[in-house]
Amino acid sequence: MENTSVNKEPSIIVGGFVLGGAMIGAGMFSLPTIMSGAWFINSLFILFIVCFFMFHSGIYILECISKYGAGTNYFDISKELLPKWACYIANASLIFVLYILIYAYISAAGSIIYEASLLYGINFNLRAIFFIFTIALGATIWWGGACASRLTSIFLFIKIVLFILAFSGLFFKAKGDLLFSATFAGKSQLYLYPFIFIIIPYAITSFGYHGNVCSLYKLYNQNERKVVKSCIIGCLLALVIYLLWMIGTMGNLPREQFITIIQKGGNLDAFIDSLYTVLNSKYIEGFLLWFSISAVFCSFLGVAIGLFDYILASLKFKDNKTGRLKSGVLCFTPPLLLCLFFPNGFLIAIAYAGTAACVWAIICPAVMALKARQKFPNSGFKVWGGKKLIYAVIAFGVVGIICQSWRNLIYCLFIVK
């Protein structure tokens, strides 16, 4: 077990990598597919906007917990700073997002590990993969937060190396006429603008690190500046990786091919199979496969650490073997069971996670920051930007919720024939 008496603060790079691991993962595989309507330039513009607002909503959570000290979690601050009904909605949204993301990553892990087993001539049972994957990585989180954080950093480093090895060829082969195409299936750019709104729920999920803010605040011994720097590193790292990812995929796969991926359910294996068609090297195919596996591992660990700590603190379990085991059972059993019965829900889960994240990760932190400034007008850390930025963040969260409804309508009108 982790020695809790050791209070040495890790580097901000470790914190940035933990947040990057939570953001950069299996969810990024949904981006090129869901961006195939709006395409490269429009999608890049949306990513910058979403990154800006998600960064600030995350440090609003930091501002609120800094008023109450280490060991405080999202439930505690929402109970103190929100009306009772809003507190229940916020925490229900948080729990829903974290659970459904863990479900999505178990689903993605199963499909990609199954694909890898077939590549090497082994035929594993898909549901057995779900079970082994969850138990193995869940055990590292049970062992201790520092252990899981370091493992996440290792997987993220491996993922970046494999990303470079797998996609360096794709970057050089990227075609400008594909990236900057202004038409699709003979339709004008004006026809494509509604697809911009589809991107926002997925992009919100792709910059979701908020469940880890409380854990980082505890990890850095209430050092707000280190947490903010870690958030900056994590968000910028995610933004750069997503940009390179978009160039490597959209510059090589025709837009029409993404429709085929969507029709196959948008799962990770369908997207990987499409990329195989433009790769001419078995080595690069192997790098791509292992990159996908490391991406799923990173995302799972990053999100699961947040939910595990939330359950541990909210239910007042002791931070020992027994207490952490109880937290682990409650954290991993529901998404594992859901995956056993509904194994192919990756793309749908990512979208609905983004919608619920608008409530707990964007709107509620901004509202709580307003309340905290009224309650503690002269104390401690305060996010820059004043009330105008807070109101802008709230408005962005409302737009994100509306976009999920638009996504369903737009797909019915433009994708489903």
Curated annotation (Swiss-Prot):
Domain of life according to the entry: Bacteria
Biological process annotations from GO: amino acid transmembrane transport; L-tryptophan catabolic process
Location in or out of the cell: Cell inner membrane
Record GO cellular component, one term: plasma membrane
Residues that span the membrane, as ranges: 12-32, 34-54, 94-114, 128-148, 152-172, 190-210, 231-251, 288-308, 325-345, 346-366, 383-403
InterPro entries: Amino_acid_transport_2 (IPR018227), Trp/try_permease_CS (IPR013061), Trp_tyr_transpt (IPR013059)
Key words, A-Z: Amino-acid transport, Cell inner membrane, Cell membrane, Membrane, Transmembrane, Transmembrane helix, Transport, Tryptophan catabolism
GO molecular function: aromatic amino acid transmembrane transporter activity
Topology of this chain in the membrane: Multi-pass membrane protein
Regulation: induction: By tryptophan. Is subject to catabolic repression.
Family: Belongs to the amino acid/polyamine transporter 2 family. Mtr/TnaB/TyrP permease subfamily.
Function: Involved in tryptophan transport across the cytoplasmic membrane. Plays a role in transporting tryptophan which is to be used catabolically.
Protein name: Low affinity tryptophan permease
Organism: Proteus vulgaris
Taxonomic lineage: Bacteria, Pseudomonadati, Pseudomonadota, Gammaproteobacteria, Enterobacterales
Gene that encodes it: tnaB
